[in-house]
Design a protein with these regions (language model features):
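Two-component/phosphorelay signaling modules centered on CheY-like receiver
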Residues: 32-52
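Acidic catalytic/metal-coordinating carboxylates
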Residues: 56, 84-87
């Protein structure tokens, strides 16, 4: 085999790849079908590793408080089984500059976008019309 085939010259061992570490995402979405599709899409198209999920505001805030450094991307739906995504935004106010918070909602009106951005979101995308923009946001360096 040769270097182009992915082996170290003369050793027969696979060469180490120098891929950037996968972005670690935590998902706050109560609809299992949407959540599963989102996780699959983020993994396949954006190289994102999902580290967990919550279906409620309280569950999300608890996990975020217990794992403050275990994520780089937080994806939040606004309407949850209990509580709201706006409450989750408040719960992650003490995050590092490298951590990004994205609201992904079916209700991304101008007013909702303003409220989410004022509440701490870095970006807001509509689930039904802005998935390409969402994925592009997730893959570009910040």
């Amino acid at each position: 085999m040769n270097l182009a085939a992915g082996t170290l010259q003369g050793t027969g061992h696979p060469s180490p790849t120098r891929r950037p570490a996968a972005l670690k995402a935590y998902i706050v979405e109560d609809n299992a079908v949407i959540r599963d599709n989102l996780v699959e899409t983020l993994t396949e198209l954006a190289g994102v590793q999902t580290v967990g999920y919550a279906e409620t505001e309280q569950g999300a805030c608890t996990w975020l408080a217990q794992h403050p450094r275990d994520w780089q991307l937080l994806v939040v739906d606004l309407f949850l089984q209990q509580g709201s995504g706006l409450g989750v935004l408040k719960g992650c106010g003490q995050r590092s500059r490298q951590q990004r918070v994205v609201v992904l909602s079916n209700y991304a009106t101008d007013d909702i976008r303003r409220r989410c951005l004022a509440g701490g979101a870095d970006a807001v995308f509509d689930k039904s019309t802005e998935l390409d923009q969402f994925l592009a946001y997730c893959t570009r360096p910040h």
